[in-house]
Amino acid sequence: MKKFLVLTVFVFMFSSCGSQGQIVTSNVNTVEVKTSLRPKLVVGIVVDQMRYDYLTRFESKYGEGGFKRMINEGFNCKNSHFNYVPTYTGPGHASIYTGTTPKNHGIIGNNWYDKTTKKMVYCAGDDSVESVGTTNKAGKMSPRRMQTTSFADENRLFTQSQGKTIGISLKDRGAILPAGHTANAAYWFHGRDEGAWISSSFYMNELPQWVLDFNKSEAAESYLKVWNTVYDISTYTESGADENNFEGGFKGKDKATFPYDLAALSKENRGFDILKATPYGNSLTTDFAMAAIKAEHLGQDDITDVLTVSYSSTDYVGHNFGVNSKEIEDTYIRLDKDLERFFNYLDATIGTGEYTIFLTADHGAIDVPSYLQSMNIPAGYLDNKATKTKFEKYVEAKFKNSELIENVSNNQIFLNRTTIDSLGLNINEVQESMVNELIAYKNVNKVFSAFTMTTTDFTTGIEALLQNGYNQKRSGDVILVPKSNYISYSKTGSTHGSGLNHDTHVPLLFFGKGIKHGETLNKTVIPDIAPTISALLGISFPNGSTGIPLGFVIE
């Protein structure tokens, strides 16, 4: 990439936007736009399933160079929330980088029912592209289902594609959606018996040599080792007992207790995929991110590059072992060390004060409901099968037809419009009838129709969150809200997806060039991140952005 962004201008005189430096012009001359006031590299870090209280709960175990460095030298938004439902990985990553909600960017879940094809679709799935780096279908992915731009896209447009964008994550959606539509590359990890970083023909026809070399280096193999706690387990007083009834564990091991021999357990746990559910998946991601910076020469000139890194292992560990486990505590202690290692690398290769980082999460997580029950806190599990059977009987009795329902998924009901029309029924009346039926069901807290979502302007409460997550083209006809602390999940491990604070309240840290030192308890929302970074860079906001730049964060 060039050190200066070269533009051709005519008679006009321009003065710079604050972050772009000074522009000197003359008639029909080549103009050098100095961009040294902008960071050389923006790194977006998403920690999958990180609740805000993990920053404070494990604080005594963190070193000075990871999370604490961001807090002590950067800006801490202590009351940052997702402003929509559902709080899943796909929508979370899309919302962080596009500056808007599923209502606009269209990623309404990890998977959803497509009303046109009558099939379930995956948020990053794309059968029109081919896998690169594997013969497995795991590479048939792209960002095409995301309907708006990311700030990384806008940076590519602003720099005439001279600023690079690369996305990295163990999860495909965690790499693809943040990097946007114009990324140079997105890479994700394919486990099983391969243990390799792969991509898609959306970005390239073959892996670059540095990725091939990394895959051949046996980096993944090196982490198939014993996982034990970093410190003496007796000092892990911020979490529950190591042996309890609330954790899943790994196949091939009777108890979900330390230590874990990953090499031995890998055979019964999908080979290299076992790494995803350990902190070593985060370490491998860090290794690969640093290799990308070196090989792609990111941040080596004055034209801003963007690197998106999503740490997925925290989510896998949380789902498996739960919020209160020793395993989740050790995972965050180790992630803190990986962050310190990563920041030190950025200091050495980009230069201290020459890069900007933000760190947040794509959603939080609920405490294991069975654990909450043991603490006398109201919680439980949904019997979706029984609810669906009861509801289908109602529909058949009410409308004398068993084909009105096409799909039930993500707490939404999709109706068969063709059948409803053929019966001469009014769609709005059918929806409202179902709302009145479902609201009487046990463990259902609220129910809304698509008609209500599209004709009523909600500004507060779960209704506003649902509306921000409702996409008229893609969402269902009836939307259910389960009773608080009731989930559709196994009785071990944790999950997420609700509009409650345990799922919406996540960290938001800014650090590096152009960032003030401070903190705020004023409420901020996730869509504010992208326009804040855009304002820092002096570029256009993402085209669907509804967030507000956090001016108090920027110097």
Language-model-detected regions and their locations in the chain:
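Secreted, luminal/periplasmic, and some membrane-associated catalytic domains
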Residues: Y62, N79, Y88, N110-K140, ...
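Substrate-binding rim/cap in mid-to-C-terminal beta-strand-loop elements of soluble/periplasmic
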Residues: A386-L425, T495-L537, I554
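Beta-strand elements within well-structured catalytic alpha/beta cores of enzymes
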Residues: P39-R51, M70, I96, N155, ...
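Active-site-proximal N-terminal segment of extracellular/periplasmic enzymes that hydrolyze or transfer
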Residues: I23-F75
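Bacterial Sec-dependent N-terminal signal peptides
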Residues: M1-V33
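His/Asp/Glu-rich, glycine-adjacent segments
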Residues: T101, G109-I303, S312-H319, A440-K442, ...
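Short, solvent-exposed turn/loop segments enriched in Gly/Ser/Thr/Pro and often Arg
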Residues: C77-S95, G167-A175, S310-S312, A361-G364, ...
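Short, structured active-site-proximal loop/turn typified by the sulfatase FGly-forming signature C/S-X-P-X-R
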Residues: L55-N104, K164-I168
